[in-house]
Each structure stands twice: as structure tokens, then as C-alpha cells.
Amino acid sequence: MSNGTRDVKEVGLSRRNLLKLTAAGLLGGAAITLFPHLRPAHSAATATDSTKVLVIYYSYTGNTRSIAEMIREKTGGDVFEIETVKEYPADRPGTTKEAKRELETSELPALKKSPPDMSSYDLIFVGSPVWWYTVSTPVMRFLTQADFAGKRVSAFCTHEGGVGKFFPHFKEQAKNAVVLDGLELYKPRQAEEGEVNKALDLWLSKLRAEKIEMKGVQ
């Protein structure tokens, strides 16, 4: 990669790319680019119906946290924040270097809390920044500890330089999960809030449709 720092930090969204938000189809490996300003918005109230939702996330700068909170507001779900025992450097180059070391040595960071009890949830979201074109190491550590036990799981990520192998790596590491379509958000902090809302509503509506289809084959 040409610049590790760009992939560790979570940043905003450029007007030049006007909300380059992508829903990545994990089951079939396809990617669908969403331009929410060209699509009708969907009601958040119809996104999950009575589905009980849990939103799990790790955030370095606050970008992923802001998206997690938006998902919580739209779904009425519970939130669980992944926190590391150690503190990463405040400067992004320092965190870039540490993340690279963790990936190269497989020394994933210790977490403050064990995974929550997920047995009562119908749909679980897991959010992460993209670090070195893959899942951030704190979320990797969480995935080594979590057993989704057949739960429906959807990942979302924030980045400014490409997702790389984020989604296939997430699918490989999410043990016993039924992995649904995920969402990548390119530079979300510079996007207009309405555009991000539309993208999230469209994604949630798609997940709701998948739930109906899954019920139909049971």
C-alpha cells in the first residue's frame, strides 16, 4: 500500500465523490454502488419491524461511532462498544505503525470487555474502520472471542482509501454467523447528514427484504 495512515484513520467524505457509499454483497461477493441522492429514501420505521437489534462497533476517531449511533436510532437496537485495554497513539501515523505490527505478528489487542450475550438478538451489526485494507485489529480480536451461533450479522465500515479485503476477511472471521450484505461508507464525515441517512435507510430496507426471503424458505 502507498500510505498506511490513510487506511487507519477514519475521515470525512469529499464532495468530489459526492457520497461514494457502497453496499457490499457478502453472500455473492458482488458490490452495488449506492448513490442515495438518486434513490428514494426508505422509512426507518420499516427497516427492521420487530427485529431485536444489537449494534457492535469499534471506533478510533469517532466516525464509526457516529454511524453506529445512527443505526441504533433507526432500529431501536442496543449498542456495545469494543474497547481496547491499551490506548492507541493519538497521532495517526503512530496508530498506523502499531496496527501494522499487530497484523504482521498476529498480536491482537486485549479488550476491556468480553462479547455480550447475543442469544436474544435477531440481527447484529458490527462496525469497524478499515485498517490496512482489512478489519481493524480490535474488531479482529472481538471476532476471535465471539460466537454468533447462527445469528444474522451485517458488517459496516468507514474508510477513505478503499476497503480492500475487509468484507471477505470479516466473513471468514465471524464464526457461525449468517453474514448478510454489508455497507462501506467512504469519507462519511464530509457527507451531508441527509445523504448518509438515505444510504442507511436503503441498506436497512434491503436487509429487511432479505429477512422476508429467508423466512419464505424455512
Give the label of every model feature segment:
Residues 79, 178-185:
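Short beta-strand elements in bilobed, periplasmic/extracellular small-molecule ligand-binding domains
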Residues 96-178:
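Helix-loop-strand module that forms the ligand-binding subsite of alpha/beta enzymes
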Residues 185-218:
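Glycine-rich phosphate/pyrophosphate-binding loop and the adjoining helix
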